[in-house]
Amino acid sequence: MSVVFRESTERGLLSSVDVGLLAVRDRACLRLLYRAGVATADQLATLIFPSRRTALRRLRRLWQLGLLERAPLAPERGGIPVAYRITRRGSKRLGYVDTRTGGVSRVRHTLDIVDAVCALVRSAPGSVQLWLTEPMTDGILPADIRPDSIVVLQRDGGSAVVCLEIDEATEHSPMIRARLGAYERALAGREGWHLVW
């Protein structure tokens, strides 16, 4: 099934929207979608909104305003999930450079990354202190290492920095071994840094 994002046909004039007047959570949602690329309502309910119902209501409003576009995903079990991403016009209106990428495999990969972060958030609420998406990780580790995400965790017993690599079975084993070796060298001597593949 292909992923086709569509803007709302019922949206009002985007130029009349003052994004500074949006609710704080709505602006946080737009920032997260810009940085992560794409997310579902369930994921956004875990990361930003207080409930799934609120997430669906707020996402629909942002979609109607022309700030978001959405696409149905292949159902995994009952119901058809919907993925959201910021529109080209929405990016421009918010002062962002449009960096969206398409393709079914890229959308699935991005949703899996967001799922991993959501699992960390759900497993220990309040422990995720920082989440850097792939574009934000540039320059943190050596040039040959660019994790899908870096997550900083803080618990009573200590803290950790987790480099997330989501494998979609698109790389051959020699490439994976080379990347694991590069991570081993890059993380050597960095106490508290871990790789989750």
For every predicted segment, state its role.
Residues T46, C118, R122, R185:
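Short, well-ordered alpha-helices that flank and scaffold nucleotide-derived cofactor binding pockets
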Residues E168-W197:
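Catalytic cores of nucleic-acid endonucleases
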Residues M1-T101:
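Nuclease-adjacent, charged terminal/linker segments that flank catalytic cores
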Residues R60, V114-V121:
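A broadly conserved amphipathic alpha-helix scaffold signal in soluble, globular proteins
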Residues A71, R106, C118-V162, E168-A178:
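Active-site metal-binding core of divalent-cation-utilizing nuclease and nuclease-like domains
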Residues V97-I113:
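A short, highly charged nucleic-acid-interacting micro-segment common to nuclease
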